[in-house]
Design a protein with these regions (language model features):
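Chalcogenol-based redox active-site neighborhoods
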Residues: 1-147
Length: 147
């Protein structure tokens, strides 16, 4: 798993619209990258909706959800739940492997990474409560002086 102090990896993946996203392009803004096991499951849906409902409080902060489903699954998940942040389709599992969160079962662990504006990893949540995770992330960003 990436350790605090690591640079955001230079890796390219597709978003929910099939557009290429280079993670290094997130440098310049505080960035929250949260990994979740699977679209449309109860915990993952609660976590995504928690971020959606709190996006107004994530001013000038990139929020990015990542799981191993494909673009089509992410697009449906995004539209069904009116999500308002980027989802990364890690269907080849390279993003999860790079971040060190791929389970032996082939899905991502529920882990969240907070990067500062310089792209330096400042905090890792490896224990996540999906229902109120967005609020936990906001509190940690504030505690770290990144807001």
């Amino acid at each position: 798993m990436l350790k605090v102090g690591a640079q955001i990896p230079e890796i390219v993946a597709l978003d929910q619209n099939g557009e290429k996203i280079n993670f290094r392009d997130f440098v310049g803004k505080v960035t929250v990258i949260y990994f979740y096991p699977k679209d449309f499951t109860p915990g993952c849906t609660k976590e995504a909706c928690s971020f959606r409902d709190n996006m107004g409080r994530f001013k000038d902060i990139n929020v990015v959800g990542v799981s191993v489903q494909d673009v089509d699954s992410h697009k449906r998940f995004y539209l069904t739940h009116s999500l308002n942040f980027t989802l990364i389709a890690d269907h080849d599992k390279k993003v999860s492997e790079t971040f060190g969160v791929l389970r032996p079962s082939g899905v991502a662990e529920r882990v969240t990474f907070i990067f500062d504006k310089e792209g330096i990893l400042r905090y890792v949540f490896d224990k996540v409560n999906p229902e109120n995770h967005a609020e936990e992330v906001l509190a940690k960003i504030e505690e770290l002086g990144l807001m």
